[in-house]
A protein has these predicted regions:
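Membrane-proximal envelope biogenesis segments
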Residues: 1-198
Length: 199
């Protein structure tokens, strides 16, 4: 009877506490933020990587994720994971969360020019068409938890929610779960990141 009680207690405890080492949890979080920073850099390089356009327009969702969601997700899938073991899953999840697309819009615009009548020598104005090229960059962030929900079974999702409620027994890890990156909401490609000191 005592053995059964102990076994049950151990199981519940295991379902509420992160089992990976702090360094691996923070390491995986750092690696995911690195993917986000690389994405931000790619967006900022758009005029350099795609020169020769008259205008660059950006349609950007915020680049951000909740580190608690990522850690609870990885723990649900792998339990006592190491930083190196989850590299493939980090990249796979990142590709599902973010979608970057680009396209070119060509507009026909008109400019006013002054011409000289060859017969009378009198100047006059006319409209001359020209092409105006706009390079569009769009970033969609589906949200990390949307991706997580699609990945997990019902039983796994319940376990994930427990980790979220308990913060895996380690509330000190991310200081309340500040997002990995932020945006000023202006729709410009410049995204300012605030990296926690412990990362």
């Amino acid at each position: 009877s005592c053995s059964i009680l102990f076994s049950g207690t151990t199981q519940v405890s295991g379902q509420t506490i992160y089992t990976a080492e702090d360094r691996d949890i923070k390491g995986a979080e750092t690696d995911y933020k690195k993917l986000e920073k690389d994405l931000d850099k790619k967006i900022k390089r758009t005029p350099t990587d795609h020169p020769g356009y008259d205008e660059y327009q950006y349609h950007l969702d915020e680049i951000t994720h909740d580190p608690w969601q990522l850690t609870s997700f990885l723990t649900t899938l792998y339990d006592d994971y190491t930083r190196s073991e989850v590299q493939g899953k980090l990249k796979e999840t990142f590709k599902k969360q973010y979608k970057l697309t680009t396209w070119v819009e060509v507009q026909t615009r008109y400019r006013t020019v002054v011409m000289i009548d060859i017969f009378t020598g009198i100047p006059y104005t006319t409209q001359v068409p020209y092409q105006y090229k706009i390079f569009h960059t769009k970033l969609e962030n589906r949200g990390l938890e949307v991706v997580i929900r699609e990945e997990l079974t019902e039983d796994q999702w319940k376990r994930y929610e427990i980790f979220q409620d308990t913060k895996g027994g380690r509330p000190y890890l991310f200081k309340g779960g500040l997002p990995a990156g932020g945006s000023d909401g202006s729709g410009t490609p410049g995204i300012d990141y605030t990296v926690p000191a412990e990362a």
